[in-house]
């Protein structure tokens, strides 16, 4: 089976690109002894009677599934970021990145014409093209490619902030939804609530985002704890932008005592205004803006905190990968119940943490106090967070679910 992941960017800049990259690497590394099709997926393509190991296909079933003995070949086609030119990057024997020079980048959209010409040339080589939305350049390239094979549309989010762009893009988006054989979303909530997917629910499937667990450096973790004199650390991480709702997390500090320390990692355009808010509220002893946290320190901040807080207020926050990073470290989560967003599905209320109404600083503080009130309660939520991660959000589970959906898609006529 040969797959093409189609989208943006490389090098990876954000969550959508990270999912596409991780799928490319994970799928191209899939062999017979690793994650493969489940029995459900195999039966969809008529393979229930061939030899089947517990986690993959036997050699006898390969030809019927259209697979080589080596497993899955998976390439990733994208526009380049950071001035990257057109090049082919070999990831492993079965995976490549086909990177194309970006001529123009505006409104979070790239113009990379060489994607169109290359895709027209090579599209026929792939059994499935897995396109990641929103990305007008990728959609245009697919539209002009003449590709006749199966299409999986990965619906990461609706286009929410670029309204002018959407007016021009909507005809292509509508074509893409109709053209797709299968539509994938990261949560069942977002799939069910998106106004653009209401007429195609029968071909929607869910693949939650999966990641490698974060592993804290114990020495660095202790340094962070010592830096704040053993106070109870509440950690949050993300760009300092309006939809993250950080001012409500800052306001929540008014309802906490000095045994707590809220650390907010990340940079962005609202840094100065958020710092003014901290100063005006008089909570500087309980809230600190860390700025951009070095990648090598992130896991240790998760390890040093008692819980993670996601205060986002808009549907722009569709999933919240930082939540599952915290869960992988066994840290409970306080998140918000954003209408039509999957955030509160990711954080299972009462199990991995507590979900509260958006824009409610008192509710955020109350949830923090509830989880940290006593050791037994914290341990219950900590265990629940670790269990929810292991059962739903590992990279292995994401790859396995994706393979099953490919099998189902290939069986469609």
List PLM regions with ranges:
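Nucleotide-activated donor-binding/catalytic signature segment of Leloir-type glycosyltransferases, i.e.
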Residues: 273-293
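Conserved donor-binding/catalytic core segment of Leloir-type glycosyltransferases
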Residues: 4, 223-254
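Short hydrophobic beta-strand element within catalytic cores of glycosyltransferases
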Residues: 332-337
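Short alpha-helical donor nucleotide-sugar binding micro-motif in glycosyltransferases
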Residues: 123, 177, 292-293, 300-305
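Acidic donor-binding loop of glycosyltransferase active sites
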Residues: 303-318, 331
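Short His-centered aromatic/hydrophobic patch
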Residues: 131-138
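Donor nucleotide-sugar binding/catalytic pocket of nucleotide-sugar-dependent glycosyltransferases
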Residues: 78, 173-219
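N-terminal strand-loop element at the rim of the active site
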Residues: 5-13, 17-42, 47, 52, ...
């Amino acid at each position: 089976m040969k797959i093409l992941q189609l989208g943006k960017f490389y090098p990876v800049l954000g969550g959508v690109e990270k999912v596409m990259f991780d799928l490319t690497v994970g799928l191209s590394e899939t062999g017979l002894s690793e994650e493969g099709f489940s029995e459900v997926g195999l039966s969809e393509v008529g393979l229930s009677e061939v030899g089947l190991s517990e986690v993959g296909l036997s050699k006898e079933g390969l030809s019927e599934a259209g697979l080589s003995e080596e497993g899955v070949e998976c390439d990733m086609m994208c526009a380049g970021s950071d001035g990257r030119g057109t090049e082919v990057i070999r990831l492993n024997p079965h995976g490549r990145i086909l990177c194309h020079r970006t001529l123009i980048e505006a409104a979070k959209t790239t113009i990379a014409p060489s994607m169109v010409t290359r895709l027209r040339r090579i599209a026929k080589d792939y059994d499935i093209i897995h396109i990641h939305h929103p990305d007008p350049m990728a959609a245009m390239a697919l539209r002009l490619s003449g590709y006749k094979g199966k299409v999986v549309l990965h619906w990461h989010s609706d286009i929410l902030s670029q309204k002018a762009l959407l007016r021009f893009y909507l005809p292509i988006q509508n074509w893409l939804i109709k053209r797709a054989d299968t539509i994938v979303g990261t949560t069942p909530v977002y799939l069910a609530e998106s106004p653009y997917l209401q007429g195609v629910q029968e071909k929607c499937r869910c693949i939650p985002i999966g990641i490698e667990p974060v592993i804290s450096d114990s020495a660095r973790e202790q340094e962070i704890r010592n830096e704040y004199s053993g106070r109870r650390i509440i950690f949050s991480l993300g760009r300092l932008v309006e939809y993250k709702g950080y001012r409500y997390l800052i306001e929540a500090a008014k309802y906490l005592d000095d045994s707590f320390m809220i650390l907010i990692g990340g940079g962005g355009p609202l840094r100065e205004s958020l710092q003014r808010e901290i100063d005006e509220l008089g909570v500087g002893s309980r809230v600190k803006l860390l700025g951009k946290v070095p990648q090598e320190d992130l896991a240790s901040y998760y390890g040093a905190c008692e819980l993670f807080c996601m205060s986002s207020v808009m549907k722009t926050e569709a999933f919240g990968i930082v939540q599952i990073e915290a869960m992988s470290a066994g840290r409970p989560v306080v998140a918000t119940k954003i209408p039509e967003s999957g955030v509160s599905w990711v954080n299972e209320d009462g199990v991995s943490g507590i979900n509260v109404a958006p824009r409610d600083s008192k509710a955020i503080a109350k949830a923090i106090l509830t989880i940290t009130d006593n050791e037994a309660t914290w341990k219950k939520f900590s265990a629940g967070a670790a269990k929810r991660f292991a059962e739903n959000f590992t990279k292995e589970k994401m790859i396995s679910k994706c393979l099953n959906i490919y099998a189902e898609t290939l069986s469609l006529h």
